[in-house]
């Protein structure tokens, strides 16, 4: 099922770039691009205890964004052009040809000072 991005409203159609926020008792919020999740967290005034998740770009498996390896690629076109990619581990990143030339980004750049959990 293709969810709509909670930030830009585009369809979340490519699992390699997907992200989501979950909180107890709340509907999950889906994002088509890690840049959309970052922008939503910066703008949101919601105080729910959100946990941020990102799809591993290579395996499409969910992992906690706070523990993920994140990088920005100028060569990979992401849905909203952020260039942000995530992997569950450095080993997954190293096995992904799309990671070549990508520059590491600290998760705090996406999650903000609250670490994506509020």
Where are these regions (language model features)?
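Intrinsically disordered, low-complexity linkers and terminal regions
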Residues: 1-30, 34-118
């Amino acid at each position: 099922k293709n969810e709509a991005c909670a930030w830009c409203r585009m369809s979340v159609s490519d699992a390699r770039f997907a992200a989501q926020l979950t909180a107890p008792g709340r509907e999950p919020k889906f994002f088509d691009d890690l840049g959309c999740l970052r922008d939503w967290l910066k703008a949101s005034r919601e105080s729910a205890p959100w946990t941020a998740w990102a799809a591993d770009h290579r395996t499409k498996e969910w992992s906690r964004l706070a523990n993920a390896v994140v990088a920005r690629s100028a060569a990979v076109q992401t849905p909203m052009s952020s260039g942000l990619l995530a992997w569950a581990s450095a080993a997954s990143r190293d096995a992904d040809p799309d990671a070549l030339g990508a520059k590491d980004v600290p998760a705090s750049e996406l999650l903000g000072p609250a670490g994506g959990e509020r």
